[in-house]
Every structure is written in C-alpha cells, then in structure tokens.
Amino acid sequence: MSECFQDGTATFLILGSICTRNCLYCHVAHGVPAPIDEEEAARLVFAVKSLSLKYVVITSVTRDDLPDGGSRAFARCIGTLSESLPDIKIEVLIPDFQGQVAAIEEVIAAKPAVINHNIEVAPSLYAQLRPQGNYETSLKILSRIGGTPSIISKSGFMIGFGENSADISRLLEDLAAAGCQAVTIGQYLQPTIDHWPVRKYYHPDEFTAIKKTALEMGFRHVEAGPLVRSSYHAALSGSGGA
C-alpha cells in the first residue's frame, strides 16, 4: 500500500461493498446490495484531491441487480474526475455487465486511459469457480476495448487453482488475440477454509518465466509475481512500460 501511495496511486471501490455473485475464490461479501449513491462521484473527487493522487483506479463489485450493471456510475465517476482534475490519469477495472454492449460502450465513451477487465481464471475452471461468469463474454469485452486505439486494454488472472502450463499459455494467447496490451498475473491465496483450496504455490522463478513468455507474445506491460494484483504498478500499465 505504501508503495502505491508513494507513486501517487490509489484504488477506489464504487457501487457499494456487496456483490451479486459468489465466485469460489473471492472474499467480497455477496447478497443484496444497497441503492446507488448518487453523490459517489463528487466524494471520489474530494478523496482524490485530498490525497494529491496522480493515477486513480476505479473498480466495483458486480451489480447484476442494476439494468446497466453499473456502467452509468463508472461513466459518471470518470467524467466528473476528468472535468475536475484533468491531469489525473484514470484506470477502470470493470465487471462484465452481463455482456451488455451498450454498457461497455458507455464506459469506453467516457475515455479513461485504461480499461481493465479481469479474465480471472483458466477457461477449464470457469464452471467450478465462476459459474455466473462466461469466458467468451469476457474475451468479447476485451476485444471491444482492444479495438479502441486511444484506450489501453488490460486484463489479469490468478494461478494456483489447479490449472496447468497449457491453460496458462491459452489464457495469454487468448488475451493477446483479443488485443489486450497489459496483463497482471498473481498467486491465488485461499481467503478462508470455505473457499477453493490452493492447488499449487508457484515459485517466483515460474512467474518470471511466465512474464517473459507474455512479453514475447507482444504484451506492452506485464506484472507477474506471487503478490501481484490488478492494481499493482497500475501507473506503469497506463504508460505502457514493461
């Protein structure tokens, strides 16, 4: 956390803290979310100003209860921040909006510097770990983002669930084919005894090898390591550095 603040970077969660999905690797609370806070964008601007931030990541829980999945809230936060603090770089980490094209277009139209949509896990594990998600839907979202030259397309996934090297290669190949420019790869850590068990702890050298492979595939920026998460060194992905 101190490393992020030192770089003037912070991540903000919008749309509440209750997720409408229940993925087996995630410790975010799930259930019935509260109504949208219409003042959230203004409060976000106040927080960013107060912290003197240079790079802001905006993410959310999944809100399948909302007709647009929360895309309007993302667009409003991006627009309000851009208008109030034009020198701030903005990255958003979005859910899948149930694949709604209009919702994805609304976020793209708001013109953040980076749009991240995490693919999360190997496709062979989706049915078990992400039963409410869809691998192909996520790839289509990333392809649409990747087709917008002014926006950096980013994704990420965790390993340690029981995938093999072929699964990891397929993930990287599919992300590259979708036009993804930046990727984060981290070790899955089991949040509680009730969550999916860790099947393998990868050695740092293995992460180094995966990063090398990803860079050779053409990704502009790759973060790979045991403790890497979506927002780690986010400002570097926004600049396109390796």
Where are the regions a protein language model picked out?
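Auxiliary Fe-S-binding modules of radical SAM enzymes
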Residues: M1-G8, A42, F46, R76-D87, ...
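N-terminal [4Fe-4S]-dependent radical SAM core
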Residues: M1-P35, Y55, S230-H233, S237-A242
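Core AdoMet radical
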Residues: T11, H27-R43, S50-V101, I108-L142, ...
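Glycine-centered secondary-structure boundary/capping sites
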Residues: G16, L51-L53, Y202
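Short, small-residue-rich loop/turn micro-motifs
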Residues: G16-I18, S60, N118-V121, Q187-L189, ...
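Alpha-helical protein-protein interaction elements
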Residues: S17, L66-P67, A127, C180, ...
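Short, glycine/serine-rich, charged loops/turns that create anion-binding
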Residues: C19, T62-D65, F97, G162, ...
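Glycine/Thr-rich phosphate-binding loops of Rossmann-like dinucleotide-binding domains
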Residues: N22, L66, L125, I193, ...
